[in-house]
Amino acid sequence: LKCHNTQLPFIYKTCPEGKNLCFKATLKKFPLKFPFKRGCADNCPKNSALLKYVCCSTDKCN
């Protein structure tokens, strides 16, 4: 699986074994949905008071 791992959409990395999801975190209160953090995960992180997480399982989907 290949996931973006920076705020720039053309930079990505291959996820290590066992990390089968890509995630993207955006700031909930910020009007633009600019990615705050991206990367690989084994489980989808839980939303927090400040961050909303979206997970997916195909190459470069985050």
Curated annotation (Swiss-Prot):
Origin superkingdom: Eukaryota
A GO cellular-component term linked to this record: extracellular region
Protein function: Potent inhibitor of human Nav1.8/SCN10A (IC(50)=141-380 nM). Is highly selective for this channel and acts in a reversible manner. Shows a depolarizing shift of activation and hyperpolarizing shift of inactivation. In contrast to the very similar cytotoxin A5 (AC P62375), does not seem to bind integrin alpha-V/beta-3, since it does not promote or inhibit the proliferation of HUVECs and C-PAE cells. In vivo, in rodent models of inflammatory and neuropathic pain, it alleviates nociceptive behaviors more potently than does morphine.
Residues forming coiled coils: none
Protein name, UniProt field: Mu-elapitoxin-Na1a
Entry's Gene Ontology molecular function annotations: sodium channel regulator activity; toxin activity
Organism this protein belongs to: Naja atra
Tissue specificity statement from the Swiss-Prot or TrEMBL entry: Expressed by the venom gland.
Main localisation: secreted
Taxonomy of the source species: Eukaryota, Metazoa, Chordata, Craniata, Vertebrata
Record InterPro entries: Cytotoxin_Cobra (IPR003572), Snake_3FTx (IPR003571), Snake_toxin-like_sf (IPR045860), Snake_toxin_con_site (IPR018354), Toxin_cobra-type (IPR054131)
Entry keyword set: Disulfide bond, Ion channel impairing toxin, Neurotoxin, Secreted, Toxin, Voltage-gated sodium channel impairing toxin
UniProt subcellular location: Secreted
Annotated family: Belongs to the three-finger toxin family. Short-chain subfamily. Orphan group XV sub-subfamily.
Disulphide bridges, residue numbers: C3-C22, C15-C40, C44-C55, C56-C61
Miscellaneous comment as given in the Swiss-Prot or TrEMBL entry: Is classified as a P-type cytotoxin, since a proline residue stands at position 52 (Pro-31 in standard classification). Negative results: Shows no or very weak inhibition of rat Nav1.1/SCN1A, human Nav1.2/SCN2A, human Nav1.3/SCN3A, human Nav1.4/SCN4A (IC(50)>10 uM), human Nav1.5/SCN5A (IC(50)=8.51 uM), human Nav1.6/SCN8A, human Nav1.7/SCN9A, and Nav1.9/SCN11A. Has no effect on transient receptor potential cation channels TRPV1, TRPV2, TRPV3, TRPV4, TRPA1, TRPM8, TRPC3, TRPC4, TRPC5, and TRPC6.
